[in-house]
Structure formats: C-alpha cells, structure tokens
Regions:
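Conserved structural motif at the start of ABC-family nucleotide-binding domains
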Residues: 4-6, 18-21, 153
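Helix-to-loop junction immediately C-terminal to a conserved catalytic motif
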Residues: 50
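Conserved ABC transporter NBD signature motif
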Residues: 55-70
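Q-loop/switch helix immediately C-terminal to the Walker
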Residues: 78, 83-102
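Conserved ABC ATPase "signature" region
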Residues: 101-116
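Hydrophobic anchor residue at the start of the ABC signature
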Residues: 133, 172
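Catalytic Walker B motif of ABC-type/P-loop ATPase nucleotide-binding domains
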Residues: 144-148
Length: 195
C-alpha cells in the first residue's frame, strides 16, 4: 500500500519562517487539502514536497523512502506552455517523456480535441489550464501536487477536475491540493496554513 508520511516539516528562507510543524499521513486514495491566505506557505509546502525547495527540518517519506523521487507530478502557477506549439504538439512531447500512448484521448477528455491544431497562444487561460491538467493524466504519477488548480477554470472545468481527482484517488492515487475555493466537498486531511 502506498503511503505518504510527512513529519514535523519546516521551511525557513533567509532566516524567516515560512511554515513549521506540518505533519500528516496519507494512504493511497487520500486527498489532503491545503487552505490559507495568500503568503501562508501553501505553494512553498507543495514545492518542498516536490523537492524543489530544501527541507529545513522534518521528514518526508513515501513508501519508506526519504523522497517522493519520480512518483509525483506538480501542477503549479506557471504552466510552462509554449505559445507557438499546438495542444497536440504539447501533449505529444509530454507523452513521449512519460511513454503514454493514447494522448489524443486525453485531449478529448479535457475538452481540447477541437482545439488540438490551434497554436496555444490563441487558447483562453481556462483552455491552457485544461492543457496543463492533461499532463497530469499522461504522467501516470501516483502523487498529484496541485497548486490552486482551479485557476481560470469555468464551472465545467472545475467539475472535470473534481472528476479526474476522484478517479485518481479511486485507483490508489494521492493528491495534495492547495485551494481558496471549497470545491472539494470530501477530503481526508485538511491543513489550514494560517494556524
């Protein structure tokens, strides 16, 4: 059984405390919701979990290893979408990295099938967010780290994202999600970064 154990995690930057004493244990199928005001450390916590920012104190273990290694995908604020490529080309690139074969079905699933040949610079922000979300699916990673994933999504896009998270968890995936919006009616662990 997959397990993510975070114990007494702390992060200091330039001597300033960003957060401290963060602990939680997630099993396969679990969702952890991070809430809090802007600047409370939600993004930093996700980046620490991903290994992009060093841990000041504490530990992160996934399946008894001291790292998430190659088991996670982080969806952050910067989507990294190249304006001159098409959604088809973008997902073809990511699919080749993750050895995912049926990426055209993923474009259809996220509602971008009819836009697959349009350069990304002509997509709306919501469509770009859907393209970024499609990378989660082709990554096949067991842990999703989602930083404000509702950004620019309309009601239909939010509903799609909830459905994808539910499916991910149903098949044993773990999700750690920061959000100002209470779009998740059900979660297994909640961390209020303001406390």
């Amino acid at each position: 059984m997959r397990k993510l154990n975070v114990s007494n995690l702390a992060c200091y930057r330039s001597g300033n405390k960003i957060f401290s004493d963060i602990s939680f244990n997630l099993n396969e199928g679990d969702v952890c919701l991070l809430s809090g005001s802007n600047g409370s450390g939600k993004t930093t916590l996700l980046r620490v979990l991903a290994g992009l920012i060093p841990i000041s104190y504490g530990s992160i273990e996934y399946n008894n290893m001291n790292t998430l290694e190659d088991n996670f995908y982080i969806l952050g604020h910067r989507l990294g979408i190249k304006e001159e490529v098409t959604p088809y080309e973008d997902l073809l690139f990511w699919s080749s990295i993750y050895n995912y074969k049926n990426f055209e079905n993923v474009l259809k699933r996220v509602g971008l099938k009819n836009y697959k040949s349009l350069k990304c610079k002509y997509l709306s922000q919501g469509q770009k967010q859907r393209l970024a979300i499609s990378r989660l699916l082709v990554s096949k990673k067991s842990i999703w780290l989602l930083d404000e994933p509702l950004s620019s999504l309309d009601k239909e896009g939010i509903s799609l994202l909830k459905e994808l998270i539910d499916e991910h968890n149903k098949f044993g995936g773990i999700a750690v999600i920061s959000s100002h919006n209470d779009f998740l009616k059900k979660y297994d662990f909640h961390i209020n970064m303001d406390k």
